[in-house]
Amino acid sequence: MTGFGARLAEAKAHRGPLCLGIDPHPELLRAWDLPATADGLAAFCDICVAAFAGFAVVKPQVAFFEAYGAAGFAVLEGTMAALRANGVLVLADAKRGDIGSTMAAYAAAWAGDSPLAADAVTVSPFLGFGSLRPLLEVATANDRGVFVLAATSNPEGATIQRADADGRTVAQLIVDQVGLFNSEVGEVTGPEPGSVGVVVGATVLNPPDVSGLGGPVLVPGVGVQGGRPEALGGLGGAAPQQLLPAVSREVLRAGPSISEVRAAAERMLDSVAYLSAV
């Protein structure tokens, strides 16, 4: 299988540079006249799968599935399988992070050969970038991707992410370490896009420099959270093709009509299409 970085680049080139979120928040379920149950969750996801067919990347927010226990995970597995059947890359927004054997277990679940394994997964480096090594290695071996939190769109994140770490912000340190990992892998795999990226929020002031990342940049916070699609170009010194804007509520609030959700997604895609320009 081709590495995630190359698959992502191809998907964006053919289907546009947009990541659509599946965030089945209880308030959205109510707005869609669905019960806040596993059955309501499944119905919500069925609508999203149908509406998002043919787009490049879809990002299920794992926490909203976990809330329903085993039944929620069953819905997540089915949703991921259905998205893949439609040719969509699946990014599991799980934000996992731990050490040693526990991190290895997360790696097996999300980047190995389990029913939950996604094309890519988000992770937290709070326990140190080196703690992510088990998952990074499993993801690389299985041609999957990883997005490491660096500078997030929530205002509370700045307290830690903008702290000084030997002359660099913590966010910049994370970006630089991801860049080094991509360089190491590139020496073995050859000149293809890196499969490990970072998360940099659309509303972050003074974002880290990602010009040397060698991988993709997931950009949440577009739409309802205040990030403007037209203002993303050059974020952190990124090349346009590096950026992958992510949007959820701005699109999902158009539901429950499949056609209306899809139309909202297409409007958002039109607004970020300039990021595909060579």
UniProtKB/Swiss-Prot annotation:
E.C. designation(s): 4.1.1.23
GO biological processes: 'de novo' pyrimidine nucleobase biosynthetic process; 'de novo' UMP biosynthetic process
Positions of transmembrane segments: none
Catalytic activity: orotidine 5'-phosphate + H(+) = UMP + CO2
Top EC category: lyase
GO molecular function: orotidine-5'-phosphate decarboxylase activity
SUPFAM superfamilies documented for this protein: Ribulose-phoshate binding barrel
Active site: K95
Pathway the protein acts in: Pyrimidine metabolism; UMP biosynthesis via de novo pathway; UMP from orotate: step 2/2
Gene3D superfamilies linked to this entry: Aldolase class I
Record-linked SMART domains: OMPdecase (SM00934)
One Pfam family linked to the record: OMPdecase
The entry's keywords: Decarboxylase, Lyase, Pyrimidine biosynthesis
NCBIfam families: pyrF_sub2
Membership in a protein family: Belongs to the OMP decarboxylase family. Type 2 subfamily.
Protein name: Orotidine 5'-phosphate decarboxylase
Species, as recorded: Mycobacterium marinum (strain ATCC BAA-535 / M)
